[in-house]
Every structure is written in structure tokens, then in C-alpha cells.
């Protein structure tokens, strides 16, 4: 197993120099971060960027989404695929506007109740937008963890082991959002 006392500062240093200049990294607005996470599901970053920018030009706030029509959101999504993501995001924005006065819940339990929000999306949004100490585990992070822990077992066991380890590590990090994004970038750019 890798020495985490060395690894975490090294990862942070690498990320500060190598992080990708993505538009959703220039904001702490939970709506914009959430939108990016939904769009990035099963879709490459380079494909998402123009859709993300176009969407925000038309619907810059969660309230704007809640107040528009489903048809308009689907038109903006057209070509991105996996349209259930858009329908769920639209429904979820309406719920947030109505039940939470337009404020995305900072409680993981409440956020997970929204349509289309799963463990990964909740952890990503809450750690990046609100600094909550929730680890993310996507394919990129899985590859990093498998190498660091020299793990070659089955995926289900790997998920359990990696999440437990990440939960320990993220407590050591002052910015859990940066920690999660650093692991994702490292997995995407280095551990391919």
C-alpha cells in the first residue's frame, strides 16, 4: 500500500499544476456544478463543454430551469443523449425551487431523494460546492485506487475497500472537492 502521508500532498501539488481548466471549475455555484455532473455521466468532457456553456447562456440559474418548460430543456440537451438525465434534472430543479426555496440541499440524505441523484453525483456536488467530506468513486478514481492499493479483486469488493480508504483520506484533506477532482483528473490523464 502506498504511503498516504506522502501521496496526498503530492497529489495536491500535481493537481495545482495540471488540473484541467474546465468551465465548471471556475464556480462554486452548486447548480452549475450539479449540471456539469449530470451532463458528464456517460459522456466525455470535450463533448459536454459546449452543451454546458449553451445551457448556462439560456438557463443561468436553477430558478430559470424550474420556470422553463421541459421541452426547452430537452431542446438544449439535444444531441447529448441519455435524455432521462435531462428530464430528471428538470424535475429535480423544480423540486428544489418549490421545496427548498431554490437552495440545493447540503444534506446528502435530502439531495439523494431528488430524481436522478445517486451516490456519485451527491458526493461530487456536495464536496465541490459545499466542502462536505464525501469521497467520489468513478471509473477514473477506481483505476487510481486499484493501482495505489495493488488491488486486483472483483469490482464490488473494490468499491467497498476503496470507499472506506477514500473516506479516511478525505478527512486529511482541507478541501474535499479539490481532493476528489484531483483523483478524477489523475485517473483520467495519467492512469488510463
Predicted segments — roles?
Residues 2-192:
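Catalytic cores of DNA base-excision repair glycosylases
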